[in-house]
Amino acid sequence: MRFYFGKEEMSSLISPYDFTEVTRQLRSFFDEKGFQEVHTQNRLSILAACEDPTTVATYEYSGQIWPLPQTGQMWLEYELLTKPELPGCYCLSTSYRQEQNPTEGRHELIFPMFEFEAPGNFKDLLQMENDLCKHLGFKCDHGRSPFTEDFPGGNYMSMVAHYAAADNELLAFHESRMYEEYGDVFFLTEFPEYTSPFWNMKIGGTGPKDVKLANKCDVIMGGMETIGSAERATDVQEMKEQFYTISNGEYANLLFDLFGKDRVELELFKFLSHNFVPRYGGGIGVTRIISAMKRAGLIVND
């Protein structure tokens, strides 16, 4: 069933059986690792907007304008950076994405998201996501493009070449082809800077023509990006520079236009005042992981 506001489709209704089954499995995985659950939905933040500035919507509350939250990531970062004894933390929240041209079956304008943050590096992130996929029941029955311990994958630029992608950009139909070629799970990593990785993602090495590469991993599940994750940056100057230049500067300028430059920079500089340590994090689209698990025959609540 779809939910409409006027004539505009907003989101689909999620079966409580599917939602309970998937979130139970996600929680159990992170609970076993000693992660703490954080309630982020009652925390207001300007930086709770993702990297695509065209999807940001706003609301007025208590006399101020705020962005409808798209991620709880910054609050998980806050908990991790102010409580270094934590082995990790996670949250389950609602993400509002005002997609300009949503694709049916792929984009939800409002959806639940399960997010996590933990100390560690990019290698630790890939291992954790490998283990999470196994925990959820995913398997790989072939040896094509082995990448992690149990699943196939490849870096962004190699997959651009593999599919001869126009404009050096991978699109939704390329993700569908990854499913057809490699199966239920594919690890897509090392995104070039021109794809506008979020401003607090760590820039690792360089690719062809000295293109900077972010330590970012999208886990393609059931033919769609389902887990978006990355190693976080520790260099304050690097994060500051990326904040002002992401999406060709549109991200910062849109936030300035909506909420005022002084207000935005106050929140940014407060975040950048933390003592940064190696860490990683990511977000899991709950509707997409339900879809992927159904496609793999791992959910049979219908």
Indicate where each model-derived feature is located:
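Short, hydrophobic/aromatic alpha-helical segments in well-folded domains
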Residues: Q25-L26, M128, E267
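TRNA-binding/sensing appendages of the translation machinery
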Residues: M1-T55
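A translation/RNA-centric and nucleic-acid-associated enzymatic feature enriched
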Residues: T54-P119, K123, G153-D302
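Short amphipathic alpha-helical segments
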Residues: D18-V22, N121-M128
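Short amphipathic C-terminal alpha-helix that caps PH/PH-like domains
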Residues: L126-G137
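Flexible helix-coil linker/hinge segments at domain or subdomain boundaries
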Residues: L136-T148
